[in-house]
């Protein structure tokens, strides 16, 4: 009996505590709901945190409301730049809901916007693992995967020849005594594992990318080498002895080279390695044990070049027309691509672009023989140091074939040791692209045998730079040679530095002080060169404006007459003076001359959405050259307070006659949120006004393409010489390959093109967001991919094809995880889904 009272009191106390807790939970829930009603999301969020900490059993009931509150509060914190508070809220939320894919995905989206791509990828990846059917998380993961694990990783790992030669060179070095190895820029760790398998005692590997470092850890562990390879999440320039590695190593292996050899910082890395991480190099004549000396694989490189004619490079880097759909381009506006303009800027920008020249649409024509640009010895510290400070070398190359000088194409031979080498030449079957230096700013690009192509080459800012490209004609060469000296040998040019110096820039036009340089992306230059695009838009806009004119004229004259009667003046103005203008808005991304073209079509008030000052100045100069009255062309962002609210009325009492939207990205994908933008745009149009394009049809076909397979995923262990890498890196494969040139893609068509999808911007009920399409197989083979492109209809008669030869758009392709054997005469059913501007295509079996 004596023991029953304390128990009773405890029970009573527990009951009172539970009742108090329940009341607090109930009040907090009411307060949270009230705060939500008045949009006080921060306080609502705090109340929900209290509720869930006191009553975890309510998680399921309040989950969706809690998510909504979290996301709205996070938006406010983001707008206020309270980043730490925002991240803190998500961490609290994930403690309560650790397996909630929606919260994981939202956290990833915020991190991605802040620039934390590695961390964002982790959350997207987790969200997909939690719910493989969560399409938003999948699309986010695919987008970030392209940033984090660039597609060349797959291509290089599938390059058996490259893997075999690197393995042989490393094996040879280790056998000769280089037993301690540092792998700089380890990637998946494949070179480190080659070294360990070859018998190296100590192997260290450094990788700066968090994603690639974690991937390498998994790969090394899967291959049971984690005990023998020490992985460091750092860049080699930050490695210290003995903090990271106990002592200097005898061998550095690296493949930190890009298409232009130096672009990934190999020179800087190796200077630091020779000074701080490697044993001293063996001097000539010494034959002692290699373990006492340092060496680098690759040992050296020879860089080669060739002057080429290539229409595809030309149309992406030079504006080759003087008139666009009736618009004159003045000579005082000089368009340049970033690859060329980087010569004169202080920014460290790659001074070249890259192309797989063996697959460039239309091919290329060699205008000179292949010539040697430079050699570099990676085992010579002094030579590496002198590269950045050395004066540019002047080179003169004889022309062997007449044609248009479009670019200097560059490749290299990587000499791994005295026996093993790799070439990145376009004639080799290799994973490598070539560096391309577009030629711009010449008075005349036509060259012929007898001419010489002059240039200066250097290694500034750790980039291979080819500058001051000019053409020396035969007649000019002879005149200068005579006045220079009587020495006949000078006519051969060869390596005569004095003659090269005297003749440099003879045909290089110098920029005039009044010129406006306008730097455009290569896709923007290709767009300017796309004549059918601009002529199509001009015709379509003209038709719409013509159809609106009678109505506008009637309305305006009616209003004018009423005003005259009420004022009793009896005076009249010309129709031209009384007509209200048509308002045209172009919100396509990047540089666009469509507003200027619209301005030529009568009483039009065109608005451009370009952001950059140099683009606005260029458009003003073009308008001026075409005799536009001042202030005809307006820049819309000057009238819009919030850039995110780009789509609004031109004036409070006016509507747009035409709105031009960007529906397709240059990559070949549908623009994000395009259907939402179209819905807003429809509400902003006057009666009879149009959105351009009015609708878009998506087309595709079945193909067999080994190339697409190899560019999308590592094809088993055979390619990586028995090492188990594929399952790990293939987690980062994406189902859609972008920036394709279908005209030059190595593939075998297995069907005719079929319509897959309709996106209707003017008539939304005609959209086909989910549909099944039957495709007739006209050739037997392995179905590996479904490339797709678009027909953009400005109206029923005017159509733009994104796969045409003049198109500035590239194409894209869905790549199947598992190829399907198909037989001629068979009929396949494709399931197409369009969700939030993302398209998925699956084969129903």
Curated annotation (Swiss-Prot):
Q: Where in the cell is it found?
A: Cytoplasm
Q: How does activity depend on temperature?
A: Optimum temperature is 37 degrees Celsius.
Entry keyword Iron-sulfur: no
PROSITE patterns in UniProt: SAM_MT_PRMT (PS51678), TPR (PS50005), TPR_REGION (PS50293)
What's the EC number here? 2.1.1.320
Tell me where the TPR repeats sit in this chain: 25-58, 67-100, 101-134
Quote the annotated effect of residue 431 to H.
8-fold increase in MMA production and almost complete elimination of sDMA production
The SAM-dependent MTase PRMT-type domain is annotated at 137-466, 530-845
Question: Keyword Cytoplasm on this protein?
Answer: yes
Extract the SUPFAM superfamilies matched here: S-adenosyl-L-methionine-dependent methyltransferases, TPR-like
User: Top-level EC class, please?
Assistant: transferase
GO BP: chromatin remodeling; methylation; mRNA processing; regulation of DNA-templated transcription
Gene Ontology molecular functions:
histone methyltransferase activity; protein-arginine N-methyltransferase activity; protein-arginine omega-N symmetric methyltransferase activity
Q: Which reaction does it catalyse?
A: L-arginyl-[protein] + 2 S-adenosyl-L-methionine = N(omega),N(omega)'-dimethyl-L-arginyl-[protein] + 2 S-adenosyl-L-homocysteine + 2 H(+)
Q: Which family does it belong to?
A: Belongs to the class I-like SAM-binding methyltransferase superfamily. Protein arginine N-methyltransferase family.
Q: What is the documented function of this protein?
A: Arginine methyltransferase that can both catalyze the formation of omega-N monomethylarginine (MMA) and symmetrical dimethylarginine (sDMA). Specifically mediates the symmetrical dimethylation of SF3B2. Involved in the regulation of alternative splicing of pre-mRNA.
What name does this protein carry? Protein arginine N-methyltransferase 9
State the species of origin: Homo sapiens
């Amino acid at each position: 009996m004596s023991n029953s009272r304390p128990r009773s009191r405890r029970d009573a106390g527990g009951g009172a505590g539970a009742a108090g807790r329940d009341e607090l939970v109930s009040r907090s829930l009411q307060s949270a709901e009230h705060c939500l009603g008045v949009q006080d999301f921060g306080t609502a969020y705090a109340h929900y945190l209290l509720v869930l900490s006191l009553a975890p059993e309510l998680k399921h009931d309040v989950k969706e409301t809690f998510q909504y509150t979290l996301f709205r509060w996070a938006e406010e914190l983001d707008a206020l730049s309270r980043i730490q508070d925002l991240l803190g809220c998500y961490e609290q939320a994930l403690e309560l809901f650790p397996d909630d894919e929606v919260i994981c995905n939202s956290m990833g989206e915020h991190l991605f916007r802040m620039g934390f791509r590695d961390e964002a990828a982790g959350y997207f990846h987790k969200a997909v693992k939690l719910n493989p059917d969560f399409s938003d998380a999948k699309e986010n993961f695919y987008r970030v995967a392209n940033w984090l694990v660039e597609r060349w990783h797959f291509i290089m790992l599938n390059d058996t020849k490259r893997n075999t030669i690197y393995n042989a060179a490393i094996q040879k070095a280790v056998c000769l005594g280089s037993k301690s190895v540092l792998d700089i820029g380890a990637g998946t760790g494949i070179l480190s594992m080659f070294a360990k398998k070859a018998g190296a005692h100590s192997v260290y590997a450094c990788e700066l990318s968090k994603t690639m470092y974690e991937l390498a850890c998994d790969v090394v562990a899967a291959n049971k080498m984690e005990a023998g390879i020490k992985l460091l999440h750092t860049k080699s320039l930050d490695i210290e002895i003995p903090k990271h590695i106990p002592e200097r190593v005898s061998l550095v292996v690296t493949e930190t080279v890009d298409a232009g050899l130096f672009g990934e910082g190999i020179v800087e890395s190796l200077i630091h390695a020779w000074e701080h991480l490697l044993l001293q190099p063996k001097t000539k004549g010494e034959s002692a044990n290699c373990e006492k000396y340092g060496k680098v694989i690759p040992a050296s490189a020879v860089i080669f070049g060739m002057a080429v004619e290539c229409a595809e490079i030309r149309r992406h880097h030079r504006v080759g027309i003087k008139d666009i759909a009736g618009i004159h381009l003045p000579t005082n506006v000089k368009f340049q691509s970033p690859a060329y303009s980087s010569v004169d800027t202080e920014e460290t920008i790659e001074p070249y672009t890259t192309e797989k020249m063996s697959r460039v649409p239309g091919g290329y024509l060699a205008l000179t023989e292949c010539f040697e640009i430079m050699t570099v010895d990676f085992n010579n510290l002094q030579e590496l140091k002198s590269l950045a400070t050395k004066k540019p070398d002047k080179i003169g190359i004889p022309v062997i074939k007449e044609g248009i000088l479009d670019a200097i194409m560059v490749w290299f031979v990587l000499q791994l040791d005295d026996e093993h080498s790799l070439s990145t030449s376009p004639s080799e079957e290799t994973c490598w692209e070539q560096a391309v230096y577009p030629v711009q700013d010449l008075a005349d690009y036509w060259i012929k045998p007898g001419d010489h192509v002059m240039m200066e080459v250097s290694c500034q800012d750790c980039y291979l730079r080819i500058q001051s490209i000019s053409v020396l004609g035969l007649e000019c060469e002879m005149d200068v040679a005579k006045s220079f000296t009587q020495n006949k040998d000078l006519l051969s040019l060869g390596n005569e530095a004095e003659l090269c110096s005297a003749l440099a820039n003879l045909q290089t036009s110098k920029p005039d002080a009044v010129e406006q340089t306008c730097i455009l992306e290569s896709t923007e230059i290709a767009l300017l060169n796309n004549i059918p695009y601009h002529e199509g838009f001009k015709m379509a806009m003209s038709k719409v404006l013509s159809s609106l004119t009678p109505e506008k004229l009637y309305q305006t004259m009616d209003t004018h007459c009423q005003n005259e009667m009420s004022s009793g003046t009896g005076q009249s103005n010309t129709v031209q003076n009384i007509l209200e203008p048509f308002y045209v808005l172009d919100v396509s991304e990047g540089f666009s001359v469509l507003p200027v073209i619209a301005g030529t079509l009568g009483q039009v008030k065109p608005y451009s959405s370009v952001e950059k000052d140099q683009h606005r100045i260029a458009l003003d100069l073009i308008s001026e050259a075409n005799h536009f009255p001042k202030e005809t062309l307006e820049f819309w962002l000057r009238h819009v307070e919030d850039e995110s609210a780009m789509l609004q009325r031109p004036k409070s009492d006016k509507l747009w006659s035409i709105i031009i939207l960007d529906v397709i990205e240059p990559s070949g994908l549908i623009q994000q949120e395009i259907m939402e933008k179209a819905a807003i745009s429809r509400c902003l149009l006057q009666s009879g006004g149009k959105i351009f394009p009015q609708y878009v049809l998506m087309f595709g076909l079945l193909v067999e393409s080994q190339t697409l397979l190899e560019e999308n995923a590592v094809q088993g262990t055979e390619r990586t010489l028995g090492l188990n890498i594929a399952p790990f890196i293939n987690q980062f494969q994406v189902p859609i390959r972008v920036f394709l040139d279908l005209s030059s893609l190595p593939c075998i068509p297995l069907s005719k093109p079929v319509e897959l999808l309709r996106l209707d911007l003017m008539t939304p009920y005609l959209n086909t967001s989910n549909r099944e399409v039957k495709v007739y197989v006209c050739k037997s083979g392995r179905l590996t991919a479904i490339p797709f492109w678009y027909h953009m209809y400005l109206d029923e008669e005017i159509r733009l094809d994104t796969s045409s030869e003049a198109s500035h758009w590239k194409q894209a392709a869905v790549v199947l995880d598992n190829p399907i054997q198909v037989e001629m005469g068979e009929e396949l059913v494709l399931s197409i889904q369009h969700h939030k501007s993302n398209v998925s295509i699956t084969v129903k079996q």
